[in-house]
């Protein structure tokens, strides 16, 4: 066992260095990317000792405005009219992936409002070594922190934002929910699940390596989210079953920013604060701190034993037992939760439209940068969902898996609502007379309103509705080295005929079908296989080679089957 420690450390060290170098190049090489240039920007002067409740409300409003804006790129969002501070940051190219995105929002708002800001810039595994700090089995611990210096003339905010990109990864969120150090404290804490504890600006961490910002909480309890991706694109969705519950040591789920204060600073005549140190409120001093999302609503016991039994946690609302995700929806609703199935399917279709639109940006970026014209690799990355280099920036396995999970959730949710309506559940409201027909009509209407175009390799355009994409969802290639026709799941025939992939890439596409059938991401299994090894199996959820049969995620097909059953059950009287 001992002989594995050093190689594991070296592997982690080399990857960390490579990632840091990549981040540096990303910011500083003007030939490859936008240059981070904050010419004409205001310096970051700290004039407030702490964030007030008014500041927090202002931050929530800022996040909500950006979330609501029609922007699909990080830089475009911060340069949009939704940003009231856009005239003050000078010439600066904003870049972020999902992990950096919440920190970029928080730091930027602090800069524009003279607020203190600090962040954890070093994390290590809670125990043992790891090949990738983002996917440790027992979570991470904070080992170092950095604060924006409080100086008389202010500091260059651009340098802070660049530091964030090299310091923050999804591993920065992977810490125990009870972590409570006074010195190396975590930037965030676990909040109470209600409309006071979760609001625009709150964060959700997905154990499978994704982070989103809450940008709105609807009156019906739906939590709307916005996130960034390695290609700098922005996507919008909503909180649901694609965010898995886990042991609290991994810190998954909802998070809120921990309040900090600049202590011991000297105030100059112009109001600028100089010197001092950053302190944070401990968990016990936070009115919204809660482990409810891990232990449930029916106990206040936070012992290690209870935390270890997180799978047995129970959730209830107004005396009614609910599964966790239904509970979140009910707890976040304004008043008693009621769901109209027709409105629910429309909302989910609009979210899917956002997902498809964001995916188009990712695919187009790979094509624009010529990744599809590069030779196929000999084998896949060690894990296709979390890696480095071209694959990390231009592939879409995680994005595609989240999309398929959203489809599965849509199907299961509508099926449950139909059953609840049939049982007369008070939480389901429907005023019509033909629920199945109205659901199909709403589905088709939303599908037709969301049209995506892609340009084939021969320059002609293909038009896809939401339903078209769903029909071919398990044929959508996540592999950036493949032609755009395969990235959009073109079937053999006219549409696929313009694909210029080599026979080697043909072999890859066929072998990767097992991985395309997956909807659950597995970051802790080896997936670095060749096409022959993928074909040979064994296949299974945790095999690293994918599964043979794709799950049923097609809600329209389900509704059609119900409609046909209804029609078949109608007795036609004999003619007399």
Predicted regions and their residues:
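Active-site neighborhood of thiol-dependent amide/isopeptide-bond enzymes
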Residues: 185-193
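C-terminal segment of classical bacterial N-terminal signal peptides
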Residues: 24-34
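Bacterial N-terminal signal peptides that target proteins for export
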Residues: 2-18, 31
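Short, well-ordered loop/turn sites that connect or cap secondary structure elements
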Residues: 192-199, 204
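Glycine- and charge-enriched low-complexity intrinsically disordered segments
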Residues: 233-279
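Catalytic Cys-His active-site segments of thiol-dependent hydrolases/isopeptidases
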Residues: 207, 215-237
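Mixed-charge, low-complexity intrinsically disordered regions
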Residues: 37-170, 178-183, 266-576
């Amino acid at each position: 066992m001992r002989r594995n420690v050093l190689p594991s450390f070296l592997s982690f060290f080399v990857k960390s260095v490579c990632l840091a170098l990549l981040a540096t190049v990303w910011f500083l090489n003007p030939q490859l990317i936008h240059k981070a240039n904050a010419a004409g920007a205001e310096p970051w002067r700290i004039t407030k000792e702490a964030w007030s409740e008014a500041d927090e409300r202002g931050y929530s409003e800022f996040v909500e405005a950006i979330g609501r804006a029609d922007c699909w790129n990080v830089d475009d969002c911060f340069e949009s009219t939704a940003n009231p501070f856009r005239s003050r940051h000078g010439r600066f190219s904003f870049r972020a992936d999902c992990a950096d995105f919440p920190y970029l929002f928080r730091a930027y708002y602090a800069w524009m409002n003279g607020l203190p800001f600090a962040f954890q810039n070093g994390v290590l595994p809670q125990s043992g070594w790891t090949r990738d700090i983002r996917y440790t089995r027992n979570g991470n611990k904070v080992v170092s922190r950095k604060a924006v210096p409080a100086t008389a003339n202010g500091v260059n905010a651009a340098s802070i934002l660049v530091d964030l990109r090299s310091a923050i990864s999804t591993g920065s969120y992977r810490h125990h929910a009870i972590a409570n150090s006074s010195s190396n404290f975590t930037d965030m804490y676990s909040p109470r699940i209600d409309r006071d504890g979760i609001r625009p600006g709150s964060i959700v961490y997905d154990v499978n390596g994704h982070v989103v910002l809450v940008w709105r909480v609807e009156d019906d309890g739906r939590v709307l989210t916005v996130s960034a991706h390695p290609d700098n694109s922005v996507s919008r969705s909503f909180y649901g079953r694609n965010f898995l519950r886990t042991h609290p040591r991994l810190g998954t789920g909802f998070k809120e920013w921990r309040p900090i204060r600049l202590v011991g600073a000297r105030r100059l005549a112009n109001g600028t604060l100089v010197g001092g140190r950053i302190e944070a409120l401990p968990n016990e001093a936070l009115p919204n701190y809660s482990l409810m999302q891990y232990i449930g609503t029916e106990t206040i016991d936070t012992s290690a034993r209870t935390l270890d039994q997180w799978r047995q946690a129970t959730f209830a609302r107004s005396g009614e037992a609910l599964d966790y995700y239904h509970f979140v929806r009910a707890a976040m609703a304004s008043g008693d939760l009621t769901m109209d199935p027709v409105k629910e399917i429309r909302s989910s279709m609009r979210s899917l439209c956002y997902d498809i639109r964001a995916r188009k940006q990712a695919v187009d970026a790979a094509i624009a940068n010529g990744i599809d014209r590069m030779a196929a690799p000999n084998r896949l990355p060690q894990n296709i969902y979390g890696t480095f280099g071209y694959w990390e920036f231009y592939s879409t396995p995680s994005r595609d898996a989240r999309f398929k999970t959203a489809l599965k959730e849509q199907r299961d949710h509508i099926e449950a609502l139909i059953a609840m309506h049939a049982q007369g559940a008070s939480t389901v409201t429907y005023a019509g007379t033909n629920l199945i027909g109205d659901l199909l009509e709403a589905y088709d209407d939303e599908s037709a309103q969301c049209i995506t175009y892609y340009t084939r390799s021969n320059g002609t355009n293909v038009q896809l509705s939401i339903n078209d994409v769903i029909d071919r969802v398990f044929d959508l290639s996540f592999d950036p080295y493949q032609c755009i026709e395969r990235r959009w799941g073109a079937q053999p025939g006219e549409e696929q005929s313009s694909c210029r992939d080599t026979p080697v890439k043909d072999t890859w596409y066929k072998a990767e079908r097992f991985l395309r059938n997956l909807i659950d991401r597995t970051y802790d299994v080896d997936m670095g296989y060749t096409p022959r090894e993928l074909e040979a199996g064994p296949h299974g959820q945790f095999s690293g080679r994918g599964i043979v049969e794709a799950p049923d995620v097609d809600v329209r097909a389900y509704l059609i089957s119900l409609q046909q059953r209804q029609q078949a059950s109608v007795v036609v009287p004999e003619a007399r």
